[in-house]
Amino acid sequence: MAEQKTSGRRLRQPIVVVLGHVDHGKTTLLDKIRGTTVAAKEPGLITQHVGASFVPASVIEKLAEPLKKIIPFKLIIPGLLFIDTPGHELFANLRRRGGSVADFAILVVDINEGFQPQTYESIEILRQRRVPFVVAANKIDKIPGWRANPDTPFLISLQKQAQRVREELERRLWDNIISKLYELGFQADRFDRIRDFTRTVAVIPISAKTGEGIAELLAVLAGLTQRYLQHRLRFAEGPAKGVILEIREQPGLGTAADVVIYDGVLRKGDIIVTGGLNGPVITHVRALLMPKPLQEIRVAKRELEPVEEVYAAAGVRIVAPGLEEAIAGAPVFVARDEGEAKQLAEKVRREIEALRIKTEAEGVIVKADTLGSLEAMIEALRKRDIPIRYADVGPVAKRDVIEAVASRELNKFYGVILAFNVKVLPEAEEEAKKHGITIFTNNVIYRLLEDFEKWYKEQVEAERRKELEKLVRPGKIRLLPGYVFRRSNPAIVGVEVLGGVIKPGYPLMREDGKRIGTIHQIQDKGKVIHEARAGMAVAISIRGHVMVGRHIDEGDVLYTDIPEQHAVLWLTKFKSELTDDEMVVLKEIIKIKRKQNPAYAVVLGKPQGAKP
């Protein structure tokens, strides 16, 4: 391939990220890709970036040589730039307004385990950021009977497998990956069976361990990006645009920012504008650092050396004054002069302010370590219809706890703090203990949300049970003839529960609606019990101005005297909590009550209970 000169560049290299569930092989795949590149021994073309690895087109073509008869292609992109750190937390920082800096993604799925929680979360964030992806169906070497052919293209290795092994591969591809993509609304198929890649997600079986299928993975990635993303990959000579991946200390030079440049040119001395915790940061590039060219992979510590300029797409470390204020996930723009810097600063300020949430409404408090993770948290919460009162970048501080207390006043279930990958300051911890505010912390978004949702459900259920316990349930009893043990003060009688339930503390009324007292105690065969249900015969004591023979008689039927508000709740919020016989008794109670008050337990203008 002709050497890519700066002036003659037509397309820049696509930026590729690797996502997937923990232990599905993301890091192994990246290591394999880097190792393959070094092993290809292309002098001068093996370039490492800060936080990224570049695989030149010539290496891809060399690897894919055996495939040319099956998949003919010619590369016009310079190669592929892989972001070194896998996972969707870092991917979240590759943000740009309306999408992502990443041009393409590899979703790594263990073909034997299939989709796991982080697989779904990865797809969710790819959808949110509108990033196209292919699936690397990893660990084919773990399929029973698979005979490994190291560093061989998948299609060639497949021909060397037994028929039953091929069939097992097909079954696992379908059951664990392709069918799951269909369930999520994606058409998908094995890459070599696809005619229209714009409509179908390509699934490439690989082994990151043995290197099988890596040739196809790189060839498909390169082919798809240059064919469908040319408009996005056009090289621009103008001022650079990028995004901060990470802020770090550079020994001897102070604070530095690891940045992915996705457009234009960045030069030493340029004015750059980025986003900080307390507003936009305008500064000058003091130094640009890139790793020295590698002779072999896995060098313990890569040395960085200064360079004068960097062209997109690239990973570079920028040293500049004031970067200690900058935050990961913030955009980076090069300004031509101070006037343009002020305009860009306003643009950055608006972009970051749009992410921060500050309201007086009910909702959870969100703190995250970077703008990217904050954005991902907000999107994930909104998708789950969880309201947000306050969201910002930085550690959990005392003021966040005060916000949570204010939110709890409006809704007790939302007075909590969700802290993603950030510290909780000691004074915040103290304040939280003082006010009983729960702080959820985790460095995996889906686990953080899972923990909160579990807690939320438990709290709502506990509150519901508490409310339920306060309600008088429908109950109907008959005084058993011959079982009057005491006529008054309190009256003690034997009763049969005809329907519903009775409990101590429940008021009782006659069939004419007149209240006659309250159940004080219930006994069954001499033992005190807390409730009696339909079909039971028990002894009850009744407190109040009631005398057997004057106010009630043997054989009388009594009902629990349900307050109107309780009846409304039984007919609406807690209807599903009533048994069939309780519902029958409730209708009878409502009928009795309506003779005295026709509006009793009328809900939304419609009488409830006469014929519910």
UniProtKB/Swiss-Prot annotation:
Residues 45-49 are annotated as: G2. The gene is infB. SUPFAM superfamilies: Initiation factor IF2/eIF5b, domain 3, P-loop containing nucleoside triphosphate hydrolases, Translation proteins. InterPro entries: EFTU-type, P-loop_NTPase, Small_GTP-bd, T_Tr_GTP-bd_dom, TF_aIF-2_arc, TIF_IF2, TIF_IF2_dom3, TIF_IF2_dom3_sf. Belongs to the TRAFAC class translation factor GTPase superfamily. Classic translation factor GTPase family. IF-2 subfamily. It comes from Hyperthermus butylicus (strain DSM 5456 / JCM 9403 / PLM1-5). Transmembrane segments: none annotated. Residues 20-27 are annotated as: G1. One of its GO terms (molecular function) is GTPase activity. GTP binds at residues 20-27, 84-88, 138-141. Function in general translation initiation by promoting the binding of the formylmethionine-tRNA to ribosomes. Seems to function along with eIF-2. Residues 138-141 are annotated as: G4. The lineage of its organism: Archaea, Thermoproteota, Thermoprotei, Desulfurococcales, Pyrodictiaceae. This is Probable translation initiation factor IF-2. Residues 11-229 form the tr-type G domain. Residues 84-87 are annotated as: G3. PROSITE patterns: G_TR_2. Residues 207-209 are annotated as: G5. GO terms for cellular component: cytoplasm.
